[in-house]
Design a protein with these regions (language model features):
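N-terminal metal-binding scaffold of metallo-dependent hydrolase/deaminase domains
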Residues: 1-44, 55-56
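C-terminal cap of metal-dependent C-N hydrolases
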Residues: 8, 352-409, 413
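Active-site gating loops and adjacent loop-to-helix segments of metal-dependent hydrolytic enzymes
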Residues: 72-106, 218, 222-248, 268-273, ...
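Alpha-helical scaffold segments that flank or form the walls of functional sites
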Residues: 76-129, 133-151, 173-180, 413-421
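C-terminal helical cap
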Residues: 110-117, 273, 278-283, 321-372
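Metal-coordinating catalytic core of metallo-dependent amide/deamination hydrolases
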Residues: 134-257
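Short acidic/histidine-rich active-site segments
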Residues: 215-221, 275-279, 284-286, 295-314, ...
Length: 423
């Protein structure tokens, strides 16, 4: 089965060359796409034709670091005490909330996050999950929900020592079971300051067993570095490097805000990935990271939202403060870097047949030379008209296809009320 996008204006994601043509999109995890100006006028009845006259078509987006478990936090009751530092943000807000999550809350969080991702043109999610007292099967719950929406994914559970030995062991077991089932993902760890040497070593061994990487928050707050120096006599990145995390090409280091020169060198000379989460860092008042000297940087949202256009624009606008400035092209390339990471996993989704159809009427000329400028200054999630994931139309003219948006939102509201009553 194929999908034909007639009269589409294809924007090459590397050269930004615009070509008006018909695009043939094949369905399935291994399906492809091809520009075919001579596609037949009459298509087989099982095929679908979309008129894309005046529309831009380009690869859809991926999120390099999400927290689906936070989806029901919007508008939740305030913390019992106003946090004054990053550790208190974790203690009074996120750790207080994630301990209350159960299966239905996790499922609702994944469905509503999938809904918002899809409508924002995001067809692939790399997620970092936490639900310490409803841990067993939680990753499969998220995976099935994202599958229903039609999104590709790489999932992990953020294992830590913060809730005791039993929960730590359950986190390792959940990760091993999920990856052994054939699902693709990472071995997740929370952060150095909640991970002892035993857990760190076992996580690296588990990642090697499953030929994947470790996904961990790194020096998001200065407290992570202070704890590591006090407890282990070294920096966070040095500790991770000594344990083998940086040797794994599919490892993801989240945030990387507070790094010294040696740590930057360790990351630069490693094959691992760094993910930037600008808006979350601003929200938590932890500072701004500098990323322009790292060879592999992708963008995430850290659970703040599911809009990768917005994340790219945030990284661009803040670069003058954090990195001495960045070109629109560099910001766009950072947005697109996630695709290379996804390909390294050979995971379903994230291929050539993941596309976004944009309704963008510009008051000024849009050219091959200025496309990144338009993207950084003028594009908006409202321009996302339709979305194709693995060759299947999952958003059709602004509406989720195959699922009832109202049902998803009602379910999320129901579970949010249950969660909030426990806080």
């Amino acid at each position: 089965m194929s999908l034909y996008l007639r009269n589409a204006t294809w924007i090459d994601p590397e050269t930004f060359k615009a070509t008006t043509t018909t695009i043939k999109v094949e369905e399935g995890p291994s399906g492809g796409m091809a520009l075919d100006a001579h596609a037949p006028v009459e298509c087989p009845p099982e095929d679908t034709v979309l008129d894309c006259t005046g529309r831009l078509v380009t690869p859809s987006f991926g999120c390099g670091h999400h927290h689906i478990y936070s989806a029901l936090a919007r508008g939740m009751p305030p913390a019992p005490k106003t946090p004054t530092n990053f550790l208190e943000v974790l203690e009074y807000v996120w750790w207080r909330m994630d301990k209350k999550l159960d299966h239905d809350m996790i499922e609702a969080s994944a469905l509503v996050t999938g809904l918002y991702c899809a409508k924002n043109g995001v067809t692939f999610v790399i997620d970092h999950h936490a639900s310490p007292f409803h841990l067993d099967g939680s990753l499969e719950t998220i995976a099935k929900a994202l599958d229903r929406v039609g999104l590709g994914h790489l999932l992990c559970y953020e294992i830590s020592c913060r809730d005791g030995e039993e929960i730590k062991e359950k986190g390792l077991d959940e990760t091993d079971a999920f990856l052994s089932s054939g699902r693709k993902g990472h071995v997740g760890l929370h952060a150095s300051f909640t991970v002892d040497d035993d857990l760190l070593g076992r996580a690296v061994d588990l990642a090697r067993k499953h030929k994947t990487g470790v996904h961990i928050h790194v020096a998001e707050g200065i407290e992570d570095q202070e704890h590591c120096a006090r407890t282990y006599g070294k920096s966070v990145v040095r500790r991770l490097s000594d344990a083998g995390v940086l040797d794994l090409p599919l490892s993801i280091l989240g945030h990387c805000v507070h790094l010294d020169a040696e740590e930057r060198d360790l990351i630069r000379t490693s094959p691992c990935w760094v993910v930037q989460n600008t808006e979350s860092n601003l929200n938590n008042n932890v500072g701004l990271g500098r990323y322009n000297d790292f060879p592999r940087v992708m963008l995430g949202t850290d659970g703040m939202h599911s809009d990768m256009i917005r994340s790219a624009q945030s990284s661009y606008f803040i670069a003058g403060l954090a990195e001495g400035g960045m070109s629109p092209l560099a910001a766009y390339q950072r947005l697109r870097a996630v695709h290379a990471h996804i390909q390294g996993h050979n995971a379903p989704g994230g291929g050539a047949n993941d596309l976004v159809i944009l309704n963008y009427d510009s008051p000024t000329p849009l050219t091959q030379d200025n496309f990144p400028g338009h993207f950084c200054y003028a594009f908006d999630a409202r321009n996302v008209e339709s979305v194709i994931s693995q060759g299947r139309l999952i958003v059709d003219h602004g509406r989720l296809a195959g699922m009832d948006e109202a049902d998803i939102l009602a379910y999320a509201n129901e579970q949010a009320r249950r969660l909030w009553a426990l806080l």
